Amino acid sequence: MLMNDKIRIRLKAYDHKLLDQSAADIVDTARRTGAKVVGPIPLPTRINKYCVLRSPHVDKKSREQFEVRTHKRLLDILEPTQQTVDALMKLDLSPGVDVEIKV
C-alpha cells in the first residue's frame, strides 16, 4: 500500500527513560512487521527555566530557579506495509509520551 512513502514519528516527553522505552516499543513493532526503521534519533532537549522570588514580600536578590526539560526523539519508518500501520495503531504507549505522526 505505502511502498514509496515513509512514516515520520516524533516523540516528546519529560522523562527520558519513558521516552526511550516507547521508542524501543515502536522500533520493535515496526521491525516485526517487516519495515525498515531509522532511529531513534535524539533531537535537542528543550530546557525551559523559570525564575521565581523565594520570599513573598521582600528580598529581590534571593531567587530560585526551576527548569522543565523536554526530551525528543525522531523515528523514520521506511517502506511501511499495511500490517505495520495496523500494528502501530494498536500499539499502546505510556501516558507521558506525546506522539506526532506524519505520513
Curated annotation (Swiss-Prot):
InterPro entries: Ribosomal_uS10, Ribosomal_uS10_CS, Ribosomal_uS10_dom, Ribosomal_uS10_dom_sf. One of its GO terms (biological process) is translation. One of its GO terms (molecular function) is structural constituent of ribosome. It holds the Pfam family Ribosomal_S10. PROSITE patterns: RIBOSOMAL_S10. Keywords: Ribonucleoprotein, Ribosomal protein. Gene3D superfamilies: Ribosomal protein S10 domain. GO terms for cellular component: ribonucleoprotein complex; ribosome. SMART domains: Ribosomal_S10. HAMAP family: Ribosomal_uS10. NCBIfam families: PRK00596.1, rpsJ_bact. Belongs to the universal ribosomal protein uS10 family. Part of the 30S ribosomal subunit. Involved in the binding of tRNA to the ribosomes. This is Small ribosomal subunit protein uS10. It comes from Desulfatibacillum aliphaticivorans.
